[in-house]
Amino acid sequence: MIWEQLCNDFKYIVAWDTEFRGDMKDAGELNDPVCSVFKELKSGTVTKHFGKTLDALPYPSNETLYIAHHVGAEAHTCLSYGLKLPKYWWDTLEEDKKLNFGKVTGHGLLACCKRYNIQTISAELKKHFIHELILPNETYNDEQKSKILDYCLSDVIANEELFYKQLEEIEKVKKYDAPKTIIHQALFAGASKAATAKVEFDGIPINTELLSTIQTNFPAIKETMVEELNAEIDVFENGVMKYKKFYEMVKRNDLLSVWPVTATGQLKTDEKTIFQFAQNCDDINK
């Protein structure tokens, strides 16, 4: 039912995967595109593109549903191409989280496919392509290009199969929900991931001079604040809150009889407990 509704709503339904260089995890770099592979699911047409630039996406934004596993990656690459983001996204990673969050240990493409018995390349081979072929090189010969495109296509095909399996499971889990409702929820989730990628790509302007001043002076500011506060409530020692001193403060305020304790009998010092008593005790509120 969902597939039929999607086919009615969109002229094109496209599974898309990209490969790119860049250290987004640690250095926050923008994607350096290597390739993109698209498969239009209605016709089976496959489009491959290799290179850092792309003049236009192969299918029009207002008529196409783009399917990706972790939309943020494809959205980042799209922006790195200098293109406007597509309007409609279906994120198979997010849909897997909706179905299985808290039930499974991973939501990566290979893990998702394994649960549905979808054939994929091995995790070891995937690591080989990423860490030994794609990331270490800035240029690629024809043989390397062909291997990378084939690898990218294998992910596209795997995600296509995952998409179909997800539709089947969603229809079972949400059997009382209308297809349009399910689709709208999925599109909203996909759009939110694309929007997040846009924020990350554009960055947030920072007053680096002011930030540096704050970072340089913060230790001294913190020390002064702690000293001033400690003169009033006496719970710190060398800048660190001490349990014995905290206990005495609670005792001074006649709260020992009502203060919650841990399983070991210690006074609780979690944020929720502190907030609760801060409403009626000035020392705690400080």
Q: How would you describe each model-predicted region?
A:
Residues M1-I2, G51-L57:
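A generic local structural motif
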Residues F20-R21, A73:
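Short active-site-proximal "capping" loops at secondary-structure junctions
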